[in-house]
Amino acid sequence: MEKTVVERLRTFGISEMEASLYLTLLNTGQETVGELVDMTGKPRVDIYKTLNGLLEKAMIEESVTRPTKYCAVSIEVALDAAVLKQAYHLRQMERSKQELVELVNRRPDRAQQSHGYQF
């Protein structure tokens, strides 16, 4: 089942490692980096990179105490954040598309071209 969940999470723009670590935190609660290294067997540097990605995606939270502990937000909150981020990127692409179409259509040489291609 976890493999299926990881695959589904990936459709939300989450890497396999992020999905796996998120599920670990969702199942275990608060953990330190050292505890996550022990649980997953992954290098500490990879855990830090993955945690930073999950923090950027608002899928986990970190404590203000030392040692820092990380915990997963609820799956609903995490997926809502992922959907909002994807929607933002889609809106950015739409704006860029409009700007590119206008720029290309404004070119002086464009006005004299036909709509078809000649080879």
Model feature map: region roles:
Residues 3-18, 32, 64-85:
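Short, cationic-aromatic polyanion-contact patches
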Residues 21-25:
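Short alpha-helical "packing" element that flanks the helix-turn-helix/winged-helix DNA-binding module
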Residues 26-32:
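Short capping segments at the starts of secondary-structure elements
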Residues 33-34, 45:
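Residues within helix-turn-helix
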Residues 35-40:
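A short acidic, leucine-rich amphipathic alpha-helix
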Residues 41-53:
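Short amphipathic alpha-helical interaction segments
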Residues 55-63:
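A short, conserved structural fragment
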Residues 80-119:
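Amphipathic alpha-helical dimerization/coiled-coil segments
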